[in-house]
Amino acid sequence: MSPSTSIEALDQPVKPVVFRPLTLRRRIKNSVATTFFFTSFVVALIPLVWLLWVVIARGWFAVTRSGWWTHSLRGVLPEQFAGGVYHALYGTLVQAGVAAVLAVPLGLMTAVYLVEYGTGRMSRVTTFTVDVLAGVPSIVAALFVFSLWIATLGFQQSAFAVALALVLLMLPVVVRAGEEMLRLVPDELREASYALGVPKWKTIVRIVAPIAMPGIVSGILLSIARVVGETAPVLVLVGYSHSINLDVFHGNMASLPLLIYTELTNPEHAGFLRVWGAALTLIIVVATINLAAAMIRFVATRRR
């Protein structure tokens, strides 16, 4: 092609792109795929909607009754539908809170090590250990704490023992959340800080951590939501109490899963109402924590 021909071609209008219509076979495949994925979504949604409907229908009467959120079951007879779940709600939040106080610093320091410092064999061993710990069943964690904390060291069953088991369940979630958020921080920010002579530890504290903090907090809340409903640790490591126990190191302490398990043995109708009311209360607690995590992510995204 000569140069003059090329120049003349530039003066010609651009031909519109012509798309061939979909063949009948491709339209059928597309319709089948769309129907399949939509049906899969509906099938997956049905059990969730059914579960929520049953729990709300059977537990709504209890959670809307006066005193449900502000009273315990102290002095309440099994056949009486009185009192509330204040003691169990308090125990659930205290056990999860103590576990978070122990697991969050350890998990975040582990995440910082893996992202900022870990490059050798120790880093690979730590990553493998976290992966294994993420798959440990809650009953195994409870039995480990029982054998070490109670059978070997001689401490008694308590809410603190439950918190130790919950730490083992929370730790891998906190580590993974912190690790993912720290890796999302651009390396250019670290390099700019190093170029100004800022030490690595101060770069992590002043630059990397504040940027990753919204995602880390969201991950922490999700880890708490993951453990508040665990039943095995409370069955193995602490006894049930009808009243509030403020001492986490001594005595029995109720929780929502333990209340549900205890009231299942109550043949009276009041026990039936308390079981479903406690189940709905637990769902409300978990949903509230997840909603808080979603709001933190949303606010952090808007600010960016």
From Swiss-Prot:
Keywords: Cell membrane, Membrane, Phosphate transport, Transmembrane, Transmembrane helix, Transport. One of its GO terms (biological process) is phosphate ion transmembrane transport. This is Phosphate transport system permease protein PstA 1. It is a multi-pass membrane protein. Pfam families: BPD_transp_1. Belongs to the binding-protein-dependent transport system permease family. CysTW subfamily. GO terms for molecular function: phosphate transmembrane transporter activity. It is found in: Cell membrane. It comes from the Bacteria. The lineage of its organism: Bacteria, Bacillati, Actinomycetota, Actinomycetes, Mycobacteriales. One of its GO terms (cellular component) is plasma membrane. Its main location: membrane. The chain crosses the membrane at residues 36-56, 96-116, 132-152, 155-175, 204-224, 276-296. Part of the binding-protein-dependent transport system for phosphate; probably responsible for the translocation of the substrate across the membrane. Residues 89-297 form the ABC transmembrane type-1 domain.
